[in-house]
């Protein structure tokens, strides 16, 4: 990977992060071109399509930039594609890596952030791997363990059988990142 990077004049020891942009329709090329229009002109950032619905941006992260700036960058992508391309998108990003060989890890983290975000944070358009919280832990649990837990807790009952107050409490629990203190506060009121 280092030899290939050298041939292509790509710095190997630069801070980078991977963004995944997922559209909810088959690409007509418009979304990819819009993102390339913003980031592709910079020789330090790379934009490519992975499949019909996913675009990847490997962005250089300057010294002093952190996750707040990356969240703003992701929001710019969402806003631009929502207004100009008139398509709803979700953007997820991994952690900042320091070497080119770690870019694949940032991609895997961004992919997991996208998957976990769809399950635990469906209303969010921007999902950061570093801010997944306990949703990431739950997502990584083995399926048999989850099924066993659900069977023990719900004892054969369907979530459709719960009253509205219980469902609201469960939703608030998830909205507060499964924070037990917030949950206790909700139950007190």
Model-derived regions, located:
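Cytosolic nucleotide-utilizing catalytic cores of signal-transduction proteins
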Residues: 1-187
């Amino acid at each position: 990977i280092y030899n290939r990077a050298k041939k292509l004049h790509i710095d190997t020891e630069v801070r980078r992060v991977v963004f995944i942009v997922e559209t909810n329709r088959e690409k007509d090329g418009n979304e990819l071109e819009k993102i390339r229009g913003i980031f592709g002109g910079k020789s330090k950032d790379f934009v490519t399509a992975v499949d019909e619905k996913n675009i990847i941006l490997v962005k250089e992260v300057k010294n002093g930039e952190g996750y707040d700036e990356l969240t703003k960058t992701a929001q710019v992508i969402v806003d631009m594609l929502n207004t100009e391309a008139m398509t709803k998108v979700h953007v997820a990003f991994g952690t900042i890596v320091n070497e080119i060989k770690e870019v694949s890890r940032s991609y895997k983290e961004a992919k997991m952030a996208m998957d976990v975000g769809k399950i635990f944070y469906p209303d969010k358009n921007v999902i950061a791997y570093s801010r997944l919280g306990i949703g990431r832990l739950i997502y990584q649990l083995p399926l048999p363990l989850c099924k066993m837990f659900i069977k023990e807790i719900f004892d054969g009952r369907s979530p459709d059988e719960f009253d509205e107050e219980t469902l609201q409490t469960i939703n608030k629990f998830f909205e507060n990142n499964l924070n037990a203190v917030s949950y206790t506060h909700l139950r007190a009121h």
